[in-house]
């Protein structure tokens, strides 16, 4: 009996440790992966199933330029006319974007991409650093604005459908496996160098399965003679709140440690590149009574002296 009890307790502890190491959704469903994945993560299952009838005709991977104005559903055939060339126009110093769409009826085990050189007729080229791309990943959401009124507050969960939507651009992931009957978009950006010579630069996005070329998507960048100043010189005022406390929790590092600052640096760089010039500083503990997942703590030391006066650092 004692052995049975010990065995049962051991199993319970093992299961508890297993789930303690995994992340869970807001409703408590285990995600099957670490609580704080750093390099990559598994997407949640899609509540909607692919249509056997629609996907039956897709026998090989299909790849085309899409539009940046559409969030393509993960398991629904994209409604677009196949396009192997797209043209982007921009000033020197401007960022221009495009979206490529991959959809496949069979598994693609090692989907990856790369850029060719981009040159104009005179031999001028755009630097490799001007281009970057990332897989668009899918996250779970619901019909937040179903009534069109844009209001928050209490609501009946059963009245709002859950769905996967294309949202984050994962620039960390360099290759991925794409299951059969799945759509996988790729976001492409060119930050035209301010030193670029005006003209038309031609190149391509190469989409591969391992080393096998699936499709060459041609891309033209039309560079204007006009110049956009560096983000630090913009008159544009961007003020997005930052949450250092969320960064420390996610990366599991001590607050305000060197590791914490290192984790924040690339995030702050992204904000600066977008024109952010404002730093968020919270003076009191739990302002707004901790409405956010990671409540804000005070960034100022409060000291009450023996004589009843206050000092702040």
Named regions from a protein language model:
Residues 1-4:
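Positively charged n-region of N-terminal signal peptides that target proteins for export
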Residues 7-16:
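Bacterial N-terminal signal peptides
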Residues 23-82, 105-188:
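Surface-exposed binding patches on compact interaction domains or structured appendages
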Residues 73-88, 252-258:
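Short, polar loop/linker segments at the starts of domains and inter-domain junctions
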Residues 88-94:
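Short, solvent-exposed loop/linker segments at the N-terminal edge
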Residues 89, 101-119, 173-232, 261:
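Extended acidic/polar, glycine-enriched regions
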Residues 213-304, 308-313:
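An acidic-aromatic substrate-binding cleft motif
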